[in-house]
Amino acid sequence: MRNCPAVHCLAANGKSWLACADSLPDVSRLYRALSPNWNHQRLSAPEVLTGDYATSGFAFHNHIVSYAGKRICLLHDARWRHKISSHPLTIDYLYISKGYKGRIEELTTLFRIRTVILDTSLPDYRSDILREDCSRLAISCISLKERGALCIPL
């Protein structure tokens, strides 16, 4: 949903979580926009997460979702700027939205990035810069402006 980047994780038992990049998402707008889809799929409303959370098989810490053996990092700010690690963390999907002003290269000292997802909230010029970074670094890149919603079966 535009200007509300989030990752929706569904468990086989019908439980689900909506991990939000923004600490103050417009929850009522989210529910209005997405409840028809949830109802169609006979899903209960997800648990909306804006901060750290963990339960059996699912964790959301420092805007990194760990679920079903995958890691998805929601990036919308400078939280990782000027940070380094001797053992970069593998990130399956780096979901970048409005607010991130850096480059992909800056993140490679922290993360081993497999795929970058560019949110629709990014201005075109930022998307172009990040897409070029991905191309130069041989990292797969998906633009939600071009593709729309992304579903990843696990």
Predicted segments, located by residue:
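Extracytosolic and intramembrane catalytic regions of membrane-associated proteins
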Residues: 2-154
